Amino acid sequence: MAEETIQMVTEQNERLSKLVRTLLDMSELQTVSRNDRIELHSLIEEVLTDLEPLAQEKKVELIQKSQGAGAKADEELFLTGSDILIYRMLYNLVENEIKYNRENGSVTVSAIRKKNEVVLTVSDTGNGIDEAFREQIFEPFFRVDKSRSRELGGVGLGLAMVREVVRVHDGTIEVYTNKHSGTTFEVKMGIGTDFEKAV
């Protein structure tokens, strides 16, 4: 009983610490420089590498897609923004898709260019999200399944931060979900003036 109490207190302290860090991160969103030259394929690879231990624990495969049909596999894809914030946005999305996936499922991340936009997609093979919750999932502290809060960990701010990162980069985010094929988050952002002039 004492061990369970100690574990519970430890978990609560860790959660509180993570909450404070996340709130501090969110308070700094407007002040972070957004002039970094970001190569997206490398950034995605970094995020997937950092989340590989969690994916292995949950028995979920992480997949990175190349630019798509007609594009060279090693073709670089840049956008202008905050390297720190775009990393955090992708990290939160992929982490969320891992946690809510099924065992032996997969998470696929891709980045393509469409005219003067970059389209980032993160897809899972989970059970999907109820249509009624599609907008609510971006609200702070909202959880679709509150009964799994302790199991899944976190503080309920991951997707709220994702939405704010997208917003400060003048982008958009959409959610497509199906109970049979999982959930896909699609983020669209402008590539930046410098790169538009270069092409």
Segments from the language model and where they lie:
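Conserved micro-motifs of the catalytic ATP-binding
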Residues: 1, 29-36, 73-81
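Short helix-loop "hinge" at the ATP-lid/N-box region of the Bergerat-fold HATPase_c
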Residues: 97-98
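Short conserved segment of the HATPase_c
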Residues: 129-141
